[in-house]
Regions:
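Residues that define the transmembrane beta-barrel architecture of outer-membrane proteins
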Residues: 29, 54-60, 79, 101-109, ...
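Transmembrane beta-strands of outer-membrane beta-barrel proteins
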Residues: 31-35, 81-85, 123-131, 175-177, ...
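Glycine- and aromatic-enriched membrane insertion/assembly motifs of diderm outer-membrane
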Residues: 27, 53-95, 258-332
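Transmembrane beta-strands of outer-membrane beta-barrel pores
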Residues: 37-43, 66, 87-93, 131-137, ...
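Residues on the lipid-exposed face of transmembrane beta-strands in outer-membrane beta-barrel proteins
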Residues: 35, 60-66, 109-115, 129-133, ...
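Short loop/turn motifs that connect adjacent beta-strands in outer-membrane beta-barrel proteins
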Residues: 24-30, 69-81, 118-125, 169-173, ...
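Outer-membrane beta-barrel translocator domains and adjoining extracellular loop/strand segments
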Residues: 45-50, 95-100, 138-145, 187-194, ...
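Outer-membrane beta-barrel "beta-signal"
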Residues: 62, 197-218, 401-412
Length: 412
């Protein structure tokens, strides 16, 4: 499990650095330095032991501003985005509890993509996306910290998305404000994992080393886009590991107090998938289409046994059954930055037999039996290797993670 987490983090930063390297040739004069303060609140308002919901975050980042002098057609069509690499300190140790639960501060390394959608004199409006990894030193412990059932892993994934407004104060300085959604989770590598979702707002100040005047980002001749328009097909193999919420619920009901206090042990089950994607590339940045997905789950015997404990024999006998195979159909969209793609999919299952129905399971905190699913992740294409690619994504149900999937495939 530890090696799997390390591989996930290594994959994340491989993609981030590839994105940066392809943006433009790195030069000190294109650098920007940013300091950011942010205040957020936990979106989940039903945690019984939590007394206060707010916390502060402090961030520092170094980035590179793409510009019309030396950037590619991708940079032009994205409006000359900024690519940042930073460190954040989320002061979740500020949470106060009604019991003895303890939270610690979270430490994150991340990459950020910042794009201006509107530039008007000194004003810029746009959006930003963060991807990174987080270290959590004070996690769930059945003996010393049983109330922290949100974050149970030492290393987690971090994702952020938001909108910003900024003002150019002179040639080199910027000040601004943003509103962001932030998500911390281990991708169901371990339980309990209620995860943490937060909303908040912040202020930032930025110093630019580049000499390119912000007033000159409009009225620039269009750079010819070199891409292959038309249909493209992908064959994808994927896999990951998963801890099952139904098994957790069953053990909570059946284990004695001594076992619960010493820690409930869960097996991590392999998950496999094969997909065939058909996408139409209609712009340099975008391709959309459909995907046929076949998923394999290896824990059907354990799932049935757990359902008999949680829901009873009668509910299990009435259910459609327990098949390790599920078939999904999904709408797919990819957004490209050179050979890097953000890959998202929203799908439904025409065939899926996972025991008791989704409504009953969802009431028990198990959302993975629903009729629809989502995927969001990154792919990196290797044109010189026959258009093969590597990728990873979070597969989820109702935005609740099922597992972290690594994938490899070929585009034909």
């Amino acid at each position: 499990m530890k090696n799997f987490v390390k591989a996930a983090i290594a994959f994340s930063f491989l993609f981030l650095f590839q994105m940066h390297a392809q943006a433009q040739k790195l030069r000190a004069k294109d650098m920007v330095v940013t300091a950011h303060g942010w205040y957020g609140t936990d979106m989940e308002r039903t945690r019984p032991n939590l007394k206060t919901y707010g916390y502060t975050t402090y961030e520092a980042s170094v980035g590179f501003q793409t510009n019309p002098n030396d950037s590619s057609a991708y940079a032009r069509q994205f409006g000359y985005p900024m690519l940042n690499f930073g460190f954040s300190l989320a002061r979740m140790g500020e949470f106060k509890f009604y019991d003895q639960t303890k939270f610690s501060d979270l430490y994150s390394l991340y990459g950020s993509f910042e794009r201006s959608l509107l530039r008007k004199k000194r004003l810029s409006l746009g959006y930003l996306l963060d991807f990174g990894a987080t270290y959590n030193p004070n996690r769930y412990d059945p003996v010393n910290n049983p109330g922290n059932n949100w974050l149970s892993s030492p290393v987690m994934a971090y994702f952020g998305a938001g909108a910003f407004i900024k003002f150019h104060v002179g040639r080199r300085w910027e000040i601004g404000a943003d509103a962001m959604f932030r998500h911390y989770s281990n991708g169901r590598l371990a339980l309990p994992n209620e995860a943490l979702n937060a909303l908040g707002a912040g202020l930032f100040a930025r110093y630019r080393l580049d000499d390119y005047d912000y007033k000159e980002y409009t009225g620039i001749p269009r750079i010819k886009a070199d891409y292959k328009r038309g249909m493209q097909y992908m064959i994808v193999l994927g896999g990951g590991v998963h801890t099952c919420m139904a098994e957790w619920n069953a053990k909570v009901e059946t284990e004695d107090d001594a076992t619960k206090k010493s820690g409930i042990k869960l097996k991590a089950h392999p998950k496999l998938s094969i997909s065939v994607d058909a996408l139409y590339r209609y712009a340099l940045r975008y391709a959309s289409g459909v995907s046929l997905d076949v998923f394999y789950s290896s824990n059907m015997k354990e799932l049935e046994a757990s359902d008999r404990i949680v829901y009873g024999d009668e509910a299990v006998e009435k259910c459609p059954g327990y098949s390790p195979i599920s078939v999904g159909l999904a709408l797919v969209h990819e957004v490209y930055w050179h050979n890097l793609a953000v890959h998202v999919a929203v799908g439904a299952y025409p065939y899926r037999h996972k025991g008791v129905n989704g409504v009953e399971a969802k009431e028990a905190g198990d959302r993975e039996r629903g009729w629809h699913y989502e995927k969001a992740g990154l792919r990196y294409y290797f044109p010189k290797l026959g258009d093969t690619f590597l990728g990873f994504a979070i597969k989820s149900h109702s935005v609740k993670a099922e597992y972290l999937e690594f994938s490899a495939g070929v585009r034909i």
